[in-house]
Amino acid sequence: MKLLSFISVTVLGAAVAVWFVVGSAADQPPLEGWMAQFTLNDPPQPAPETEVLTVAGEPVTLAAYKDKIVLVNFWATWCVPCVREMPSLDRLQAAFDKDKFLILAVSVDRGGAAKAVPFLKKHGIDNLTTLLDKRMKLASA
């Protein structure tokens, strides 16, 4: 009987240990490789109030989009991975109502709208809301 109790307690202890290890690992994001470059704010921080420009040259901050779910994507015409992901982001935006979910494609090209807008037209990127951050103030905030 003592052996059975010992085995039961051992199995229960092992199960609890596994639960703690797996549970705590699931709570942590995978920050290995290139993902380690990301900074996680816990608790989440408000978006910076840094001004950027619309393609029409109007100043705007991220606060203008506070009632929406917003994905902010920094990109440049010279960034190969950025160029590759733009069509996917464009299709993703097309699948959602911009009043609820908005993808902000923030160009960090030094050429501003003169560089970004023709590039987007050439590649058929029609659904993304494009902002300009040629001095990388928002990108580095």
Residue ranges and their predicted role:
Residues 66, 74-94:
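Conserved redox-active cysteine motifs that mediate thiol-disulfide chemistry
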Residues 84, 91, 114-122:
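Short alpha-helix adjacent to the SAM-binding motif of class I
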Residues 42-45, 49-70, 93-96, 140:
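A short beta-strand-turn-helix
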Residues 107-109:
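Residue-level recognition of beta-strand->loop/alpha-helix junctions
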Residues 95-100, 123-127:
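Short helix-capping segments at alpha-helix termini
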Residues 118-127, 132-141:
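Thiol/disulfide oxidoreductase modules built on the thioredoxin-like
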Residues 1-49:
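N-terminal targeting signals for export/organelle localization
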